């Protein structure tokens, strides 16, 4: 089973990304050798286990095994802004503590990579545009953009 950790600063769009994953979704299976923790959101999709951890939580010592369990880390950033100190701190923490784990950047709320994000050009970067607003606090991302990422992950593991 492949584990995909979705993380990023507060407000970057992690929950929107997770909520936008296609249906049907299966039940998340807790990996071996990690503490049983309450995850913000988790699911199985096409043989991949997705789980969401907020950036402040991800950098806590209690969560280090969850971070190391991931086969891929999807780091969500607010694409309409430049990388902020929270994104940079999280990025540096992940690079230092999990140097051999593949990382993908998902820029939320945009359809283009701006100059400020080019620092990370050695990593695969995806853009995810806005889908629809459900209410003032809830939205879903562009279905086509999310499917592109899921397809990439599936092909990566074939």
Where do the protein language model's features map onto the residues?
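Switch II (G3) loop of P-loop NTPases
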Residues: 45-63
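Canonical P-loop GTPase G-domain recognition
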Residues: 113-158
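Structural motif
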Residues: 9, 53-55, 77-80, 108-110, ...
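Conserved beta-strand/loop subsegment of P-loop NTPase cores
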Residues: 72-76, 98-111, 123-129
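Conserved Switch II/interswitch segment of TRAFAC-class P-loop GTPases
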Residues: 69-89, 110-114
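Conserved catalytic network of the ASCE P-loop NTPase/AAA+ motor domain
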Residues: 42-46, 65-70, 95-99
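Amphipathic helical hotspot of TIR/SEFIR-family domains
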Residues: 82-107
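Conserved G1/Walker A P-loop phosphate-binding module
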Residues: 1-34, 45-48
């Amino acid at each position: 089973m492949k584990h995909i950790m979705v993380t990023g600063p507060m407000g970057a769009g992690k929950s929107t990304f997770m909520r936008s994953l296609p249906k049907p979704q299966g039940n998340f299976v807790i990996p071996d050798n990690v503490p049983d923790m309450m995850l913000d959101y988790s699911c199985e999709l096409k043989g991949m286990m997705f789980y969401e951890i907020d950036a402040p939580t991800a950098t806590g010592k209690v969560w280090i095994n969850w971070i190391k369990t991931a086969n891929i880390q999807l780091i969500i950033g607010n694409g309409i802004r430049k990388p902020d100190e929270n994104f940079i701190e999280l990025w540096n923490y992940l690079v230092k503590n999990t140097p051999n784990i593949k990382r993908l950047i998902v820029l939320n709320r945009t359809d283009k990579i701006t100059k400020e994000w080019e620092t990370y050009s050695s990593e695969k970067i995806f853009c995810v545009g806005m889908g629809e607003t459900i209410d003032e606090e809830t939205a879903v991302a562009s279905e086509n953009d999310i499917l592109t990422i899921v397809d990439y992950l599936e092909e990566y593991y074939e």
